[in-house]
């Protein structure tokens, strides 16, 4: 008798099935036996996309979770196999919070480190796996939706933006060849007015551009001349002249400037009534960021390169920023991003989710955006969305008239296309439960 009771107390749910209880009107989970276990962790890379890394989490019950991260994938991949896999293999994948706490690590626990990026990809895969175990989309597992869809803005990159190397700079802008109708980086440099009209025709009412980067590289971010400042302002002025205030415009500064020059640029942008100016200074000295934010009426938004709730808490407590931006593949995954969003909500600060990386992150972000009340806009890159994203995955979050909604399928709803795994440039690494 005692042994039977002990066995029952140790039994866990795997997989979890929804069964309706008509007498109370609630859904419940049904215990189907022993806990699910992770049996293998697999990473996947394509030479054509050297910044992307996917993670498959395999279970003993045949379910698979898919995660993704972006930028410097080799280091994140090594962390996944050398640090995360030895702990996670054999574990119940549905105990996500416990795994997140254990994997926080002695090093790399803040910022968008290799450890954080690897942990982010695994966390996204764990949530996807939970969705498949329960036959539910992620947004329902988060507590349900506070909205049915959310507005998108277009980051005006082209098809090959940041494709060739893991660096942020004008050499990696992907200019020079046209791969389709949405070469939006070239467009904002030479015909920003036409670009704005093109986006509005699709129902997209927000756009982000970064014409200051050339001047930043020329002076290493230490100075901008009046001529260079005027040249960089031209695309913003063309947009306003062409479409007025029907388009929300954001300026991306890529953390390239010193404090006085960043402030000079922000003040020059003030009359243009931007939605935000993003990452004006390098994020290694928060006092400089705070000084810039408090010294301009232009709204300042930051955060996509940060990771971990403690890191974001320092930004939020600054009480000077207009918007906190989160990248789910860099900040700690869905679990951490949700906690950061809650902290921001307590400070009455809105959040926005980053996407200039990969299709899985876009889908996971869209699910989280359905649940997070203080999220008001989701980034997208239409050149990616209507271009190479569709070459890699089975489906994408639907976008209609500038609004995005999550796929209805379990988990985040995406799977890598079978032909991706058959490509000659596909590289797979696998750690298995011994």
Predicted segment positions?
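Tryptophan (W) side chains
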Residues: 16-18
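Glycine-rich, aromatic-flanked loop segments that form ligand/cofactor-binding clefts
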Residues: 123-167
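Metal- or metallocofactor-binding catalytic centers and their adjacent structured scaffolds
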Residues: 58-136, 140
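Conserved, mostly hydrophobic/aromatic
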Residues: 38, 62, 84, 122, ...
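Structured beta-strand/loop patches that form or line metal/cofactor-binding pockets in enzymes
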Residues: 36-66, 70, 383-391
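Shared catalytic-loop signature of beta/alpha-barrel
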Residues: 58, 82, 98, 267, ...
């Amino acid at each position: 008798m005692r042994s039977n009771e002990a066995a029952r107390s140790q039994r866990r749910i795997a997989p979890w099935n929804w069964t309706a209880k008509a007498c109370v009107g609630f859904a419940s989970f049904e215990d189907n036996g022993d806990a699910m276990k992770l049996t293998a962790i697999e990473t996947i890379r394509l030479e054509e996309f050297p910044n992307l890394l996917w993670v498959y989490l395999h279970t003993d019950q045949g379910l698979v979770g898919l995660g993704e991260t972006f930028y410097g994938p080799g280091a994140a991949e090594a962390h996944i196999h050398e640090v995360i896999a030895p702990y996670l293999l054999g574990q119940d994948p549905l105990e996500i919070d416990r795994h997140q706490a254990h994997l926080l690590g002695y090093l790399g626990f803040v910022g968008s480190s290799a450890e954080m990026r690897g942990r982010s990809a695994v966390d996204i895969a764990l949530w996807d796996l939970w969705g498949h175990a329960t036959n539910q989309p992620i947004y329902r597992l988060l507590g349900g939706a506070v909205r049915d869809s959310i507005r998108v803005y277009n980051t005006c990159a082209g098809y090959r933006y940041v494709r060739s190397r893991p660096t942020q700079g004008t050499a990696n802008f992907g200019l020079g060849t046209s791969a389709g109708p949405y070469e939006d980086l070239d467009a904002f440099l030479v015909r920003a007015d036409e670009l704005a009209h093109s986006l509005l025709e699709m129902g997209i009412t927000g756009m982000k551009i970064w014409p200051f980067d050339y001047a930043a590289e020329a002076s290493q971010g230490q100075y901008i001349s009046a001529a260079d400042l005027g040249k960089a302002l031209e695309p913003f002025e063309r947009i306003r002249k062409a479409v007025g205030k029907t388009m929300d415009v954001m300026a991306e500064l890529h953390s390239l400037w010193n404090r006085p020059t960043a402030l000079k640029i922000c003040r020059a942008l003030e009359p243009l009534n931007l939605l935000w100016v993003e990452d004006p200074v390098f994020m290694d000295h928060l006092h400089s960021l705070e000084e810039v934010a408090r010294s301009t009426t232009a709204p300042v938004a930051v955060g996509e390169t940060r990771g971990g709730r403690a890191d974001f808490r320092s930004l939020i407590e600054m009480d000077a920023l207009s918007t906190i931006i989160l990248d789910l593949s860099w900040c700690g995954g869905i679990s951490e991003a949700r906690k950061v969003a809650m902290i921001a909500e307590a400070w009455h600060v809105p959040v926005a989710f980053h996407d200039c990386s990969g299709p899985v992150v876009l889908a996971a972000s869209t699910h989280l955006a359905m649940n997070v009340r203080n999220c008001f806009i989701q980034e997208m890159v239409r050149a990616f969305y209507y271009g190479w994203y569709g070459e890699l995955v089975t489906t994408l979050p639907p976008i209609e008239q500038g609004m995005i909604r999550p796929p209805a399928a379990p988990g985040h709803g995406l799977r890598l296309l079978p032909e991706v795994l058959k490509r000659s440039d596909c590289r797979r690494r696998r750690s298995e439960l011994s």
